[in-house]
A protein has these predicted regions:
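Exported/periplasmic ABC-transporter solute-binding proteins
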Residues: 21-92, 96-273
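Bacterial N-terminal signal peptides
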Residues: 8-19
């Protein structure tokens, strides 16, 4: 019985210690871009294991929602796949603090069947015409005789904003050729891999499996081309705070920008800064 009591005492002590640590740790909430989320989640997991002063939690919702969240003091850090817009500055003021966390590229991706049928490259005008609804069949761009299933991102997505700016001419451009709107990069990947005739756009780190990244204006979306700014759809990914960050927020930002965080960025398929 004495041994059993000791075992029970050890278990209870461990549970209480864990509860006390959780209660005493200061929360740091991170929200926003689904593109940046794999880096933030993996970094938060490691950061939470390495220290006991702060507990970082991460959730998606899109760049726009993340920026709104910090401006309204609902979250501490916003993940963003674009820079703050003039509209956001006018609405919330110029108190945003920007932190570069990694590099990425918006990849134009197609279903494996389309890639294998010969569509391994599109130029800017072709992508524009597909999303405008002017090109509706893959045979018009050297592919098979099949309707093009066009996937876009939801309103508020930083990736959508950047894509529209570069391809369509402005962030709020209409895209009448779109068949479905995906809520996040992972959903884009699922939609493309589940179709034999799809096209979509998503972060470089989401390519793989049946989701094939194609060359854009003759340049492939790979590590070297993005790092050297040769790929036109390259971009910077950010954390933002609204005003001076809290000690916990600053500690997490420093971790992500430091050697350990940048190693995680590379492991998650991003290009380190």
């Amino acid at each position: 019985m004495g041994i059993i009591r000791k075992i029970i005492s050890v278990i209870i002590f461990a549970l209480l210690a864990s509860a006390l640590w959780t209660a005493s740790a200061k929360d740091v909430t991170v929200s926003g871009s689904s593109t940046v989320m794999p880096l933030a989640e993996a970094a938060a997991e490691e950061f939470n294991l390495l220290q006991k002063d702060y507990m970082v939690s991460v959730s998606a919702g899109g760049t726009g929602a993340g920026i709104l969240g910090i401006a309204e003091r609902k979250n501490d850090i916003a993940m963003a796949s674009r820079e703050i817009t003039d509209e956001e500055l006018q609405r919330f003021g110029n108190s945003f603090q920007q932190y570069l966390v990694c590099l990425d590229g918006i990849s134009i991706a197609v279903s494996d069947e389309i890639y294998q049928a010969g569509v391994t490259e599109l130029d800017k005008q072709q992508v524009h015409d597909i999303y405008s609804g002017n090109i509706t069949n893959w045979k018009e761009v050297g592919g098979p005789d099949a309707d093009i299933y066009v996937i876009s991102r939801e309103e508020g997505s930083g990736t959508r904003d950047e894509f529209n700016e570069i391809i369509m001419g402005n962030r709020s451009a209409e895209t009448p050729g779109v068949d479905t709107v995906a809520m996040g990069a992972a959903e884009v990947k699922t939609a493309i891999s589940g179709s034999d005739k799809a096209i979509g756009y998503l972060g470089f780190n989401y390519l793989g499996g049946a989701v094939m990244g194609i060359a854009f204006n003759g340049i492939k979306p790979n590590y070297e081309n993005i790092k050297l700014d040769l790929y036109e759809l390259h971009r910077h990914l950010y954390f933002y705070t609204y005003g001076k960050p809290s000690e916990g927020s600053q500690a997490f930002i420093d971790f992500v920008q430091g050697p350990e965080g940048q190693k995680i960025a590379s492991e998650e398929g991003f290009i380190p800064i």
